[in-house]
Design a protein with these regions (language model features):
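Ligand-site clamp/hinge motif
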Residues: 248-293
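Long beta-strand-rich cores associated with HINT superfamily self-processing modules
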Residues: 535-564
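Extracytoplasmic/peripheral linker and loop segments enriched in polar/acidic and small residues
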Residues: 431-444, 471-538, 563-564
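Alpha-helical secondary-structure segments
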Residues: 130-132, 136, 180-184, 229-230, ...
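N-terminal lobe/hinge region of extracytoplasmic solute-binding protein
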Residues: 58-106, 226
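Gly/Pro-rich hinge or "lid" segments in bacterial periplasmic/extracellular proteins
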Residues: 187-256, 260
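Structural transition elements
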Residues: 352-392, 413-415
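Surface-exposed binding/hinge segments that line
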Residues: 149-208
Length: 564
């Protein structure tokens, strides 16, 4: 997650190949050129390799940061997933497979892990990757002076939360380098998905000497970042593009077939399609007007994703309550737009209307029931009720006219979504004026973090396979809350779900169902849709692996097949 992975998504938080929509596995970016790709149906791997192993792709947005402690969005995590590696990484079947770690042992109570590291793991400058690199990185992430939005994802590690809140010294973090190649980790509670969690970007190692040498420039340029993954980042020209090149120092470089991956930043969907048709790129996400054209093309396919998009409804701006503090106004907005029209006409890419936060077919209960089926649809479109809430809101606010701002991505597809929502809200809620504010991805993320907006078109993709990756976003003052929403009962449910209920799976599951209903009945956010991707990909492109959590896809196993 992906923030957003979980991650903030790009809009609309997905794909150039991908146009990375920042879901914050993460937050989303709002555009559909996402190259998140699993093999197309029937595609076989293991064919003959082409002489030239170069993949050409696009992204709709610039990389905001290559600092793994500070990254929060889908674009950054996607890049990091391919140039970095944690203790474990997700394999082609989305299962945890050894990365820097060769193996691990877990204590009987599930609260202590001992990882044995691979002595062949090296940084791109030739330095060995050691246990000390993980200790430094993890401490840096939870240090409140780092101001890492994703610090909370490490709160399962002993004392991480207390340290981040300034209530415990940094040296008490439950991570220890027993020797250069043995890492010991202590947890607050048993976490069944902890090994998988170590594949997430915030858990990546960092070379302390290099980070301190680069200072404030670390992670902002290709040559001020150090890599330990399958590729290295080069030729990073901001707002224009970048390259990934095979990392000769990577311990498993024999598996990597691609020599180079070229990314160009292209925000216009029509331009991307033209580049695809002219053979200048090998894969492209499609937006609505191009889907029908390509539906019968053998290069075309669609895929569902566990990412949801919604409107953030900011209740506090500039330290003052906004009109959106009024619950009736939030409910009016959340019920006033045509979700089917949005997904079927404006998007037309396999996305489906969402009356929920936690996506369909994402998480199952201890007895195998889908979370979404159990909790059903919660916040549905109902224009009649929206108007009733609108009248109550105007009365409570003492206003007949209300003007709000909708913060949006600056990609062409996201702009269409923004115009649609503006039209729906102004039509169905007479007296409401919605002013659109389209911003580059990085700036949009900053405005959200600063609570400097009214409405925001946003998305979220999961960071790990559990409903909590969506639900814990909206705790009071949570780093990804970014709405000013606060409900002590909601906070209590989340706290128990991340603590005492971890070993009481049925009770925990029921509490998460309750939390989602509470959040949406409060209209803390206004759901829009669950994202789908429509993609065209050249037949010669093989082996790109799509991940439901963390970085959207991996190129470690990708290659260009010989078409002869």
């Amino acid at each position: 997650m992906k923030r957003k992975k979980m991650k903030k998504l790009t809009a609309v938080v997905a794909p150039v190949l991908v146009m990375s929509m920042a879901l914050t596995a993460c937050s989303g970016s709002g555009e559909k050129d996402k190259a998140s790709t699993t093999p197309k149906s029937g595609e076989k791997e293991g064919g003959k390799l082409a002489a030239k192993q170069v993949l050409n792709l696009t992204e709709a947005q610039e990389i905001p940061s290559m600092d793994s402690s500070k990254a929060t969005d889908q674009v950054s995590f996607l890049a990091l997933n391919n140039v970095m590696e944690g203790l474990y990484r997700l394999d082609k079947d989305n299962k945890a497979t050894p990365g820097v770690a060769e193996s691990y042992k877990k204590s009987d109570d599930g609260k202590k892990y001992t990882f044995t590291l691979n002595k062949n793991a090296k940084w791109s400058n030739g330095d060995p990757v050691t246990a000390k690199d993980f200790v430094y990185s993890w401490k840096r992430a939870v240090d409140k002076n780092t101001a890492a939005e994703y610090a909370y994802i490490m709160f399962d590690v002993k004392n991480a939360k207390a340290i981040n809140e300034g209530k415990a010294p940094l040296d008490t973090l439950g991570v220890k380098a027993v020797d250069d190649y043995t890492l010991e980790v202590e947890l607050e509670n048993p976490v069944p998905y902890f090994v998988e969690l170590t594949s997430f970007g915030t858990f990546y190692p960092l070379n302390e000497k290099f980070v301190k040498e680069k200072g404030e420039k670390f992670g902002l340029e290709a040559d001020t970042t150090l890599y330990n993954g399958p590729f290295t980042l080069t030729d990073w020209k901001h707002e224009e593009g970048w390259k990934l090149k095979k990392n000769a120092q990577y311990w498993d470089n024999k598996t990597v077939k691609l020599e180079e991956i070229n990314f160009n930043v292209v925000k216009d969907s029509g331009t991307r399609v033209n580049l695809y048709e002219s053979g200048q790129i090998d894969r492209s996400g499609l937006v609505s007007e191009f889907v029908d054209k390509y539906k019968s093309n053998p290069d075309f396919y669609t895929q569902k994703t566990p990412s949801t998009f919604f409107l953030r409804l900011n209740q506090k701006r500039g330290g003052q309550d906004t009109v959106l503090k009024n619950k009736d106004l939030r409910l009016a907005i959340a019920k006033a737009y045509d979700k089917k029209g949005l997904t079927n006409v404006i998007l037309n890419d396999g996305s489906t209307p969402a009356d929920y936060l936690v996506p369909k077919e994402f998480a199952k209960s201890p007895d195998g029931k889908d979370f979404r089926k159990e909790n059903g649809d919660i916040l549905k479109t109902d224009v009649k009720k929206a108007k009733e809430h609108w009248e109550k809101a105007k009365k409570d606010l003492g206003k007949e006219q209300v003007t709000i701002e909708l913060l949006n991505y600056d990609s062409d597809n996201a702009k269409k979504v923004g115009e649609f929502l503006k039209g729906e809200l102004e039509k169905n809620l007479p007296g409401l004026t919605v002013n659109l504010k389209n911003q580059p991805f990085k700036q949009k993320l900053k405005l959200e973090s600063d609570l400097d907006y009214d409405l925001s078109y946003a998305g979220w993709g999961p960071d790990y396979l559990d409903p909590m990756t969506f639900i814990d976003m909206f705790v009071t003052d949570g780093p990804h809350n970014q709405t000013g929403y606060s409900n002590p009962k909601y906070d209590e449910i989340v706290a128990k779900g991340k603590g005492e209920l971890l070993t009481k799976t049925k009770e925990r599951w029921d509490s998460l169902l309750k939390a989602e209903k509470m959040l949406l009945e409060d209209a803390a956010i206004a759901p829009l849709y669950q994202r789908g991707d429509a993609i065209v990909q050249k037949a010669k492109v093989k082996g790109i692996v799509h991940h439901p959590v963390g970085g959207d896809y991996s190129y470690k196993w990708a290659y260009i097949g010989d078409e002869k």
